[in-house]
Structure formats: C-alpha cells, structure tokens
Curated annotation (Swiss-Prot):
Role description: Responsible for the release of ribosomes from messenger RNA at the termination of protein biosynthesis. May increase the efficiency of translation by recycling ribosomes from one round of translation to another.
Family to which this protein belongs: Belongs to the RRF family.
Annotated transmembrane regions: none
Name of the protein this chain belongs to: Ribosome-recycling factor
Gene source species: Solidesulfovibrio magneticus (strain ATCC 700980 / DSM 13731 / RS-1) (Desulfovibrio magneticus)
GO biological-process terms attached to the record: cytoplasmic translational termination
Lineage, uppermost ranks: Bacteria, Pseudomonadati, Thermodesulfobacteriota, Desulfovibrionia, Desulfovibrionales
UniProt-listed InterPro entries: Ribosome_recyc_fac, Ribosome_recyc_fac_dom, RRF_sf
Domain of life from the UniProt record: Bacteria
Length: 184
C-alpha cells in the first residue's frame, strides 16, 4: 500500500513541477531568461535551443541580453525570437541582442491570468487522474486478496488527503502567479 502512495505522490509532484515550468514561461512584464526557454533557433538546419547558442542574461528587470557565441547566429536568433509568438522584438547592435520587455496592458494581464488558470486546471486534472489510478490499484489489490477492505479504505483516504494537499499547493502557486501577473 505504501508503494501505491509513494507512486501517487511522485506523479503529483511531477504534475506540480510541470505547472511551475508552464508558469515560468508566462510573460509577466519582468525580464526572465526562462521566457526564452521554448525558443528554438534554426542553426545550420537543426532546431537548437537558444541557450546552447548564446549566453542569455537579464541585466535589469526590463531587459534580456543575448550574446551569441557564433557571429553567424545573430540573424537566426533574431528570426527565431520574432517567430516565437512571444511578442518580443530583438534589437541587434552587432555584439549583443537586446530585448526590451514592454509593460503589459490590463487586457493582456487578464488574458495571461486566464492562460495560467487553464494550466492550473490541467494540473488538477492530472492529479485527479493519479488519484483515480491509485484507487483502482488499491481496489485491484483488495480483489486479489493482497490487502483487506479496511486497508483499501484507509489507502483511499490517504490518497484523497494527498490529492487535497497537492490541489491546495496548485491553488497557492496560481495565487502567487496571478499576483505577479497583475502587479504593475
């Protein structure tokens, strides 16, 4: 029974980690290097992650700088950022690419909160699926006479407590992200 709980907890942790990763990609008006995590650059015919072609830094809260290691990559990096759909405009001065992060409009902030809410719902669904799988496994063990009915009921209660705990953590992460997005 403990293995079922441990497995369920590991899977819920992964769902929460995936939510945090999605949240880190949401633009909040502050410059972070994680904004560019999903950007792939077509470099000599291969889709390459930006951080493998250049050093990415945030000198202040409104600017991201990209310093490519290969001068030939400047145009490819600019093109990839423009195509990424992030709404960012790179400025190339020949040595470094600068991206200024404009302040978000009220409408854009509300849209980002909706996107964050969608990510939260996806994480909650994933956690509920983990709960369902764990409960089915406990039921199967009871039917196979590996555990008693009392143990099954206790296991299901423990899985429910675990699920409730992780859903609270998910809601807390959303509240924090919502506050960050709506902050001017």
């Amino acid at each position: 029974m403990q293995t079922v709980l441990k497995d369920a907890e590991d899977r819920m942790k992964k769902a929460l980690a995936a939510l945090d990763k999605e949240f880190s990609r949401l633009r909040t008006g502050r410059a972070t290097t994680s904004l560019l995590d999903g950007v792939r650059v077509d470099y000599y015919g291969t889709a390459t992650q930006l951080d493998q072609l250049a050093s990415v830094a945030t000198p202040d809260s409104r600017t991201i700088t990209i310093q490519p290691w290969d001068r030939k990559a400047f145009a490819d990096i600019e093109k990839a950022i423009l195509k990424s759909g992030l709404g960012l405009t790179p400025v190339n001065d020949g040595k470094i690419i600068r991206i200024s992060i404009p302040p978000l409009t009220e409408d854009r902030r509300k849209d980002l909160v909706k996107v964050a809410k969608k990510y939260v719902e996806e994480a909650k669904v994933a956690m509920r699926n983990v709960r369902r799988d764990a409960n089915e496994l406990l039921k199967k063990k009871k039917n196979d006479k590996a555990i008693s009915e009392d143990d099954q009921r206790k296991g299901q209660d423990d899985v429910q407590k675990l699920t409730d705990n992780y859903i609270v953590k998910t809601d807390e992460a959303f509240s924090k992200k919502e506050k960050e997005i709506m902050e001017i």
